Amino acid sequence: MISIDFINETDLKVKEWEDLAKQIINSGFKYLKLKNKINLSITFLDSEPAQKINQEYRNHSYIPDVTSFPIEMSPQEIKALGYQEIGDIFICIEEAERKSIKYDHSLKEEMGFLFTHGFLHLMGYDHETNEKDEEEMFFIQDEILKINKINYTIKFTEEDYKEIEEKDE
């Protein structure tokens, strides 16, 4: 069982994205064969607060499309609560829209990717540690997206990395 707390700090209507997030996270839960009940929050933010969070907690000055903050719990804590709190995902829809245009994806494909990517980070997967972990995370990410009939190809280029680095200087 999954419980998702949605927080909308934008002026946008997000019901469609809440429904997509539920669908993605439910399929991820099944794909990973999770046993514990889980709870997480998803907050929709505008560009400025998303950038502030990225600056404060990750020391990056660019506007992120997704930022995840996992919570680690001991088996004793999970047993006492009766569920596992896995963390918080912050989504900047404005940045997702910008990237969907830049990389020629629909906004639904982009949002599906962001929910999947954020969820996997909450579950402990990390693509920034080493190549093996990156391959594992991206394989699972692709499988969850396929289950949800979302065709998404990462199109991030070296130029994008340079652009991000320049914004951080």
From Swiss-Prot:
One GO CC term on file: cytoplasm
EC number: 3.1.-.-
Cofactor binding, note field: Binds 1 zinc ion.
Pfam families recorded: YbeY (PF02130)
Domain of life: Bacteria
One MF term in the entry's GO annotations: RNA endonuclease activity
Alphabetized Gene3D superfamilies for the sequence: Metalloproteases ('zincins'), catalytic domain
GO process terms (BP): rRNA processing
Major localization listed first in the record, in broad terms: cytoplasm
Group of enzyme by EC: hydrolase
Binding site for Zn(2+): H117, H121, H127
Signal peptide: none
Keywords, in A-Z order: Cytoplasm, Endonuclease, Hydrolase, Metal-binding, Nuclease, Ribosome biogenesis, rRNA processing, Zinc
Subcellular location: Cytoplasm
Cofactor(s) for this UniProt protein: Zn(2+)
Alphabetical list of PANTHER family matching this protein: ENDORIBONUCLEASE YBEY, CHLOROPLASTIC
Family according to the record: Belongs to the endoribonuclease YbeY family.
NCBIfam families named among the record's database cross-references: rRNA maturation RNase YbeY
Known function: Single strand-specific metallo-endoribonuclease involved in late-stage 70S ribosome quality control and in maturation of the 3' terminus of the 16S rRNA.
Protein name: Endoribonuclease YbeY
Lineage summary: Bacteria, Bacillati, Mycoplasmatota, Mollicutes, Entomoplasmatales
